[in-house]
Amino acid sequence: MKLQTTYPSNNYPIFVEHGAIDHISTYIDQFDQSFILIDEHVNQYFADKFNDILSYENVHKVIIPAGEKTKTFEQYQETLEYILSHHVTRNTAIIAVGGGATGDFAGFVAATLLRGVHFIQVPTTILAHDSSVGGKVGINSKQGKNLIGAFYRPTAVIYDLDFLKTLPFEQILSGYAEVYKHALLNGESATQDIEQHFKDREILQSLKGMDKYIAKGIETKLDIVVADEKEQGVRKFLNLGHTFGHAVEYYHKIPHGHAVMVGIIYQFIVANALFDSKHDINHYIQYLIQLGYPLDMITDLDFETLYQYMLSDKKNDKQGVQMVLIRQFGDIVVQHVDQLTLQHACEQLKTYFK
């Protein structure tokens, strides 16, 4: 499947298929040099997939740490200095091969190297179906995730579904959170459909039918980011579950998607409190348990610690914390939420696990 962005200009293709990696060679021929920034774990398992590409004299491989460990100033400077030592030009390309963190990092390198060079995303996880599309790139600060970054469109996104076959279950769980988030944004019918399809751990682990839901998730995100590239309006909806989720991820060091799922439940609790919504919290908790999400850490959540992180969320303004909330399916809002409501929601969340 080939999708295409529909901006007024500077559009890019998104290839979503088994064997999509074959498209890379077509692009490499257009660049004077290419630097493949590859996650150390992906390199360990899939190095042979890139042998043909690396046979090109003008292609270099740079192995970087896996996950969020790579999104540091130190790694950023080290990588830039190495690339600059090869006398690059603006017709150089940075190719990100790995999960969402790899794409974030490599994209920020591409955006800032010579004020912008070509950038190709080659996501290898389910989670990265979300982050590889839309142009958000960046690194982390000691103050929180993704606070230093840019909006930078890739030249192409090449999503080879063959990479998913070897994902450990923890990464399947983490990635599924973003797939599920897109279903929630699409409404009650889409949510019921995906819950009925992936109804337990066994089916989720098999990845049966995942291709369809990944493609639908990408289409959902494209519709939103083309309408609001710089996150001034509806693109904020894509942060569903992330205000609280990022805080949980940062302080409890759990996978991104696991934390987002906790954040999704949390926002349902907040929506019930603010709007008298009738979301069935037990339903969502039981669904996550059926899928195998480890939720024991919820009893250890410390609101004061998490709140300090939430205050740094990029959606906030001078009035305080803003959250994306599902008031009702099909009625999504970005809402200021006061500290007391946030605290009560955290306390209520914990009561479900006592």
Curated annotation (Swiss-Prot):
EC class, as a word, reads lyase
Instruction: Identify the residues that bind NAD(+).
Output: 39, 45, 68-71, 100-104, 124-125, 136, 145, 163-166
Under SUPFAM superfamilies, the record lists: Dehydroquinate synthase-like
Keyword presence, Zinc: yes
Question: According to its UniProt record, which cofactors does this protein need?
Answer: NAD(+); Co(2+); Zn(2+)
The reply on keyword RNA-binding is no
Keywords for the protein's UniProt record, in alphabetical order = Amino-acid biosynthesis, Aromatic amino acid biosynthesis, Cobalt, Cytoplasm, Lyase, Metal-binding, NAD, Nucleotide-binding, Zinc
**EC no.?**
4.2.3.4
Q: In which pathway does it act?
A: Metabolic intermediate biosynthesis; chorismate biosynthesis; chorismate from D-erythrose 4-phosphate and phosphoenolpyruvate: step 2/7
MF term (GO), any? 3-dehydroquinate synthase activity
The entry's family comment says: Belongs to the sugar phosphate cyclases superfamily. Dehydroquinate synthase family.
Task: Tell me which HAMAP family the record gives.
Answer: DHQ_synthase
Question: What does this chain do?
Answer: Catalyzes the conversion of 3-deoxy-D-arabino-heptulosonate 7-phosphate (DAHP) to dehydroquinate (DHQ).
Record's protein name: 3-dehydroquinate synthase
Q: What does UniProt list as this organism's lineage?
A: Bacteria, Bacillati, Bacillota, Bacilli, Bacillales
Name of the coding gene: aroB
